[in-house]
């Protein structure tokens, strides 16, 4: 780049000597030939040391603890609907079914639904869903409603 030319992106070049060719080792007896910088003999010269080998130190995969427990294949997962959500969806009370909740967008179709007791309810609801928690059942019956569990 000439001394007087302005500094622009299309004029930029790497500094001289900044970009050097990759050294190809083990090609003939010149520099980095023959033993290719590995020294003579020994395990490290023979490409038999795995990358994970830590030189006799306890390996990382053995230093970490094993995972405990297991994943239960028979676990049932429910979609959760709380009482405060039911109070906003049904302000006048009435019948609450899984199909109604799907239609109102509270839950997805073809999944089990469980009503939990977070929040308060003051209207009578006739709830028929897959499962209901104990606290939710108490609050619904105290408000004058009924509970039917499908499962």
Swiss-Prot record:
GO cellular component: cytosolic large ribosomal subunit
Gene3D superfamilies (UniProt xref): 3.100.10.10
Pfam family, one: Ribosomal_L27A
Species the sequence originates in: Streptomyces griseus subsp. griseus (strain JCM 4626 / CBS 651.72 / NBRC 13350 / KCC S-0626 / ISP 5235)
Keywords: Ribonucleoprotein, Ribosomal protein, RNA-binding, rRNA-binding
InterPro entries the UniProt entry points to: Ribosomal_uL15, Ribosomal_uL15/eL18, Ribosomal_uL15/eL18_sf, Ribosomal_uL15_bac-type, Ribosomal_uL15_CS
Region feature (Disordered): 1-60
Lineage of the organism: Bacteria, Bacillati, Actinomycetota, Actinomycetes, Kitasatosporales
PANTHER family referenced in this protein's UniProt entry, alphabetically: 50S RIBOSOMAL PROTEIN L15, LARGE RIBOSOMAL SUBUNIT PROTEIN UL15M
GO molecular function: rRNA binding; structural constituent of ribosome
Example GO BP: translation
Function: Binds to the 23S rRNA.
Gene designation per UniProt: rplO
Summary of subunit composition and partner proteins: Part of the 50S ribosomal subunit.
Protein name from the UniProt record: Large ribosomal subunit protein uL15
Similarity field: Belongs to the universal ribosomal protein uL15 family.
């Amino acid at each position: 780049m000439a001394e007087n030319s302005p500094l622009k992106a299309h004029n930029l070049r790497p500094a001289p000597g900044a970009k050097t060719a990759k050294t190809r080792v083990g090609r003939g007896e010149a520099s980095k030939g023959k033993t290719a910088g590995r020294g003579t003999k020994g395990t490290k010269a023979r490409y038999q040391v795995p990358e994970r080998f830590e030189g006799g130190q306890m390996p990382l995969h053995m230093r970490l603890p094993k995972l405990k427990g297991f994943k239960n294949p028979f676990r049932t997962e429910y979609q959760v609907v709380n009482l405060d959500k039911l109070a906003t969806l049904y302000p006048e009370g009435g019948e609450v079914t899984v199909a109604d909740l799907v239609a109102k967008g509270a839950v997805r179709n073809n999944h089990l639904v469980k009503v939990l007791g977070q929040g308060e309810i003051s209207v009578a609801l006739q709830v028929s869903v897959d499962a209901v928690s104990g606290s939710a059942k108490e609050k619904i019956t105290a408000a004058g409603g009924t509970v039917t569990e499908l499962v």
